[in-house]
C-alpha cells in the first residue's frame, strides 16, 4: 500500500510497495519548515500543480539528478524545457497522464500560475489540482485553490485521501477547506499549505473541528513536516 510523506508546505512524497517514488510540488531547498535534503529523494516522476516558486521549487535540479519525468500543465511544461528539463509530459484540465506506478488527472483550481525569476513575474498558463491513482489508492492534491462548487464532481472519483490547503490569504482557509472536504467526500483529509510563512498561520486542530462539523465521516490526519501516513 502507498505511503504519503509531507515534506512541508505543499510538497509531498508518494512511495509504493514496488519502489515507485513520486514527488509533488517539490519546494524543498528554500522551504523553512523542512530539513529534507532534496538530493536524498529519488523520484522517477515529479508532479506539479502550478508555476509558483513555492511549488516548482527544486524541480529543475531534481529532474536532472534523477532523470525524472515531470508532469504538469502545458505552458509550465514549455518553460521547464527552456530551463533544461529533458523529460516533460504536459496536459490540461480533464486530461489523464500515465506514469510509472500510476496516473495523474488534471482538475481545475482557482488560483494563478506564475514564476518570479528575481526580476520579473512571468505567467505560465493555468493552475491545476491532481487526482492521482497510485498504489491502489486515489489521492486528490487540490494544489493552491479557492473553494469551488465542482469539487462535488471530484468527489465522484472515489477519493481516498484529499490533500487540501488551509492557509487562507492565498488559498482557501479552514472554513472553506472544511466545505471542500464535504464536497469531495474523501475518507481521509490532510491539511497543507499552512504555517510556512506568517500570512498563512493556521491551527490544524481547529480545521479538524470544522471538518467534524461539515464531514463527520472524514478522518483528518495532521502531519508534521517529514511525517508519513500509510494510505493502506
Predicted regions and their residues:
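Zn-dependent metallo-beta-lactamase
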Residues: 1-21, 27-31, 98, 105, ...
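Active-site neighborhood of phospho(di)ester-bond hydrolases with catalytic His/Asp-centered motifs
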Residues: 23-26, 43-51, 71-74, 90, ...
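Binuclear metal-ion centers of metallo-dependent hydrolases, dominated by the metallo-beta-lactamase
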Residues: 69, 81-95, 178, 182-232
Amino acid at each position: 500500500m502507498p505511503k504519503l510523506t509531507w515534506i512541508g508546505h505543499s510538497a509531498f512524497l508518494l512511495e509504493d510497495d514496488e519502489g515507485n517514488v513520486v514527488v509533488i510540488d517539490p519546494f524543498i531547498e528554500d522551504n523553512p519548515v523542512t530539513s529534507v535534503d532534496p538530493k536524498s529523494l529519488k523520484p522517477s516522476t515529479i508532479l506539479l500543480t502550478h508555476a509558483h516558486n513555492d511549488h516548482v521549487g527544486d524541480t529543475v535540479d531534481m529532474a536532472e539528478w534523477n532523470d525524472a519525468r515531470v508532469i504538469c500543465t502545458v505552458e509550465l511544461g514549455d518553460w521547464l524545457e527552456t530551463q533544461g528539463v529533458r523529460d516533460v509530459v504536459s496536459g490540461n484540465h480533464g486530461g489523464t497522464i500515465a506514469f510509472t506506478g500510476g496516473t495523474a488527472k488534471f482538475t481545475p483550481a482557482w488560483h494563478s500560475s506564475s514564476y518570479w525569476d528575481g526580476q520579473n513575474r512571468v505567467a505560465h498558463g493555468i493552475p491545476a489540482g491532481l487526482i492521482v491513482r497510485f498504489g491502489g489508492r486515489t489521492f486528490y492534491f487540490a494544489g493552491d485553490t479557492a473553494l469551488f462548487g465542482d469539487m462535488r464532481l471530484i468527489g465522484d472519483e472515489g477519493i481516498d485521501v484529499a490533500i487540501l490547503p488551509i492557509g487562507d490569504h492565498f488559498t482557501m482557509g479552514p472554513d472553506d477547506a472544511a466545505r471542500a472536504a464535504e464536497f469531495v467526500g474523501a475518507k481521509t483529509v490532510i491539511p497543507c499549505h499552512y504555517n510556512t510563512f506568517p500570512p498563512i498561520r493556521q491551527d490544524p486542530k481547529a480545521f479538524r473541528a470544522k471538518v467534524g462539523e461539515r464531514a463527520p465521516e472524514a478522518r483528518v490526519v495532521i502531519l508534521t513536516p517529514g511525517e508519513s501516513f500509510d494510505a493502506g
